[in-house]
Amino acid sequence: MESEKVRDRSSRNRRKTFLLIGVAVLVVVAVLAVVFGVIAAAKNSANSSDSFKNVVINRCETYLKENMPGKNDCKKIWGAFEQAYIGRDPCDVPPEVYDPLISSVKQDVACNTMLFWSKTKTMVHAFTDNRDCMITLEDTLLGFLFDGLTWCSRNESKETFTTDCPSWSDCQNNPVRSFWIKASLNFASTACGNVSAMLNGSLEAPFSSTSVFGSVEVKNLDPDKVDGLTVLLVTKDTDTTTCNHSSFHNLQSILDTKIAYNCREVPYSTVEVCISDPEIPCSDCL
């Protein structure tokens, strides 16, 4: 009888021991999972930063090789860009922090070639990709480097993130929005001669005073350097919007009175033909 009690006690002790060992193993596994997760996250973050940097540097080197070798230093441009947002709250990156970046990029754009746009990005870039007569912000080195990219950092972080960043309208001073506002301001303020703007005739209101073109670029055209602004209103056969649309009265009220204003309706089909046939003179396209 006594020996049975001893055996039962011994069996219970073994079960307790196995249970404790099992719990200990689970705790160790959980701790290791957290540790490895943190390490993996840090590695992924570092990889993301390096990957983003490589994209920008490669774009820079490609652009300089094809357009203006020797005038700019890609690593210095990256450094000036990175210091603008690294370690900052992604909703506290005002446009002026990109001033050093703007100063680090050296490029002169010929007068009478600058083309602004609003809600016509695909068409305007299809056109300038096949033509040398007009140039948009995204065709300059500064715009080319960051077109289509997303980036941000975090408070006291040394990393660049390309996901979970604020979108354009999430907060006013986010890194991407502030960059494009500053770059657009710079592009407009350096414009000279006669400039053009391709707008979308399929929209109910082709000009918006809250767009980057309306709120930044038009307001920063220098009347001492810019002679005139021509709106190129791209229209399809079914569109009813014309150059007489009321939104253009708003545009003219914003535009400096010393800058001549003109508007021309351009058939969508004409632009398409000019995109597919680079032999057609630019003067016959726009």
Task: Pin down the residues of each PLM region.
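Intrinsically disordered cytoplasmic terminal tails of membrane proteins
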Residues: 1-15, 202-215
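Glycine-rich short-loop/terminal segments
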Residues: 34, 41-194, 262, 277-286
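Alpha-helical transmembrane segments in eukaryotic/viral proteins
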Residues: 18-47
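Active-site or metal-binding loop neighborhoods of secreted/extracellular toxin and effector enzymes
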Residues: 31-40, 50, 58-68, 189-286
